[in-house]
């Protein structure tokens, strides 16, 4: 019952976004609690796959992004750090940093 009371405002917002319900959800930035609520809505009883990283893990990953000293290219990340940044393809990168569709959200359902 508590889940429905949490999802009701999201459902009302989606209903008001546009005349076509299928288009109201396509290609949106979804971050934080909005992303979690959208996953609950899309996945329903199946649930969804989400393993958030602790703050310590995130800080350790960012520790590898060393900046170059003075001269040309100063302030740019080293190639290894750049390569690591390009390999990230999590739900936050897909739906919060970039935009994602309903179909991309379904990829995270169990």
Curated annotation (Swiss-Prot):
Principal place of residence: secreted
Prodomain positions: 57-87
Annotated keywords: Carbohydrate metabolism, Cleavage on pair of basic residues, Disulfide bond, Glucose metabolism, Hormone, Secreted, Signal
Free-text function comment from the UniProt entry: Insulin decreases blood glucose concentration. It increases cell permeability to monosaccharides, amino acids and fatty acids. It accelerates glycolysis, the pentose phosphate cycle, and glycogen synthesis in liver.
GO molecular function: hormone activity; identical protein binding; insulin receptor binding; insulin-like growth factor receptor binding; protease binding
GO cellular component: a single term: extracellular space
Transmembrane stretches, start-end: none
Signal peptide from the UniProt entry: 1-24
Protein name, as recorded: Insulin
Gene3D superfamilies per UniProt: Insulin-like
Pfam families per UniProt: Insulin (PF00049)
Subunit structure: Heterodimer of a B chain and an A chain linked by two disulfide bonds.
Disulfide bonds: 31-96, 43-109, 95-100
Family named by the database record: Belongs to the insulin family.
Protein's UniProt keywords contain tRNA-binding: no
UniProt GO BP: acute-phase response; alpha-beta T cell activation; fatty acid homeostasis; G protein-coupled receptor signaling pathway; glucose homeostasis; glucose metabolic process; insulin receptor signaling pathway; negative regulation of acute inflammatory response
Protein's UniProt keywords contain Nucleus: no
Location(s), subcellular: Secreted
